[in-house]
Amino acid sequence: MAEVLEFRVPAGSAQTLLVWGLEPTVGLEHSLFSVFSKFGLLYSVRVHSNAAVAGPGCYAIIKFYSAADASRAQHACNGQRLFQNSPLKVCVCTKQKGFQQQVLALNSNKCQELANHYLGFNGWSSRIITLQNVSGFDDENEEVGKKRSVRYLCAVEVTLPNHGVRTRGVGLGEADVESGEDPLEFGTATRRVQKLAVGKALSSAFQKILLVVLESGKVAVEYNHAAEEPTDSLTEEELEGLVQVSELPLEPFDLEEEVLSDLTLDDELPVWEVPSN
């Protein structure tokens, strides 16, 4: 049976494994990652100490993107010692009936990781259509020396040449600068906000892609019409002409956090060349 994967944080119980009976050791998360990543791409590995009533030891929550990969890992690892002296217990997580978890879109780094795994490094490409400074349109009366807001708007196109699929996404990055008169602080904030806008736009573009993983391991791609936005019907010229945020028909979506602190001034803008305005 085929499995459909979205560029979203895995939230299904079938994609999540509970591992207990772990012996506390240095590098436990790394050991778990090394073992379970052999069965498929992992979203996360989290280790926690047992509750006091459960006695000493640890347990782990491991999230796969694919439920099929999680199932194979559970059957292969349950009852095995793996990297410790005592056997581990591994089961697929279950949730209480009626429990609903918010499903977040993957951030741009995770989107690229998922695309590289299933499509290959050369199986997709992206380009920036426009990256515009839209700061100040809502802050015309800002006082000199006071906190200033930096905003950048970005539109990105993702192309999957082997599947004939092309999608676009739009993202808005913004941050406040405590001292708008400090050129170094303002320049640093500007580059980080640019990267944030590019990352959000890339994630938005990937939301329109569905990966269909067949039993044979081959991957097909479908366009996710449910994720379409008003901006998808605009021409590139119209996208490049979007300047005022108040005129931007952005559809908000719940996005896994793009962490500004992870973006340093020394980094180049992610992967793509920024068009000159």
Swiss-Prot record:
Alphabetical list of Pfam families matching this protein: Rad52_Rad22, RRM_1
Residue ranges annotated for the RRM domain, each copy included: 15-95
The protein, known as: RAD52 motif-containing protein 1
InterPro entries (UniProt xref): Nucleotide-bd_a/b_plait_sf (IPR012677), Rad52_fam (IPR041247), Rad52_Rad59_Rad22_sf (IPR042525), RBD_domain_sf (IPR035979), RDM1 (IPR040224), RDM1_RRM (IPR034200), RRM_dom (IPR000504)
CDD domains to which the protein is assigned, alphabetical: RRM_RDM1
Quaternary structure (record): Homodimer.
Main localization category: nucleus
Presence of keyword Nucleotide-binding: no
Superkingdom of origin: Eukaryota
Any GO BP: DNA recombination
Organism this protein belongs to: Gallus gallus (Chicken)
GO molecular function (one): RNA binding
GO cellular component, as recorded: cytoplasm; nucleolus
PANTHER family in the cross-refs: RAD52 MOTIF-CONTAINING PROTEIN 1
Stated role: Confers resistance to the antitumor agent cisplatin. Binds preferentially to sites of DNA modified by cisplatin in vitro. Binds to double-stranded DNA in a cooperative manner resulting in the formation of filament-like structures. Binds to single-stranded DNA with no cooperativity. Binds to RNA.
Keywords attached to this entry: Cytoplasm, DNA-binding, Nucleus, RNA-binding
Protein's cellular compartments: Nucleus; Cytoplasm; Nucleus, Nucleolus
